[in-house]
């Protein structure tokens, strides 16, 4: 793909075609390398505040590691991307340590299976909008928000987690996270949830009473160092498949009214 026009003129043409509902073959990215080269050139031009809207990546399935370890970016506007065929977002924004806000609302994630590490180590991130995401095919969400240490709120209440198998360390180190509504999540296929809330020290309450944990094998360190988590409802949890040591230090450093006795969760 060649961009011979000045960038403003090029995007003016793209916008006109968007308004007319037109898509030209030459406006599509045909492989990941082509996309990465274009993004790097734009980031070098634009610096810490990057705007790259309305890209057609509908031919691509793999966006893993796309912005990984790009530490210069503070704000990123990538709204309007056509992502209908993407199935892999692993580590897509991992290590974007300076990124402060990101709005991905409305992205088509209906075919995504892998979100492992997608926002991991975005340690400056304060605002993240994922509204409208279709997660019905996601299998891996482990480590997805780990070390997002400045994120205070996150709305994942409408996520479809019915196919998720691994969610360990999902919110590890989200030490500023104050509220989280996961009460409606279907976790019937989840096998690993160890370290999920490790060091979420600002969380004060969690209602997980409706979680189906019948297939979980490892819950170790699940609420470790959740120092302010006093209200926690785990009533009805099934730990029959949790292996030996799979619940080690589950509530260590957590004031929640539970403990583990003979590999079972019991009230203190």
PLM regions: where:
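Negatively charged
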Residues: 2-268
